[in-house]
């Protein structure tokens, strides 16, 4: 996402729990076109935890769309930080990146 989220794991000062994770949806997510069409838009999201994500045999990391260049550029620095949840993917040995940036 534009802020470097991974699933519904939003940027924060510390890493979330390693298991299934429930989070309040960021305003940018709540305003996404796929959610706005819902009669009762969700306010929380459930996503895999970091351990489950990193336990995958292979990860397909897709970064496309407008407004993501800053987060993508920060990701390319390889600094692993909870302020950029997608950065945790640098710890996985087999990530395939697909991007239009």
Regions found by a protein language model. Name each.
Residues 2-101:
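Conserved phosphate- and dinucleotide-binding cores of soluble alpha/beta proteins
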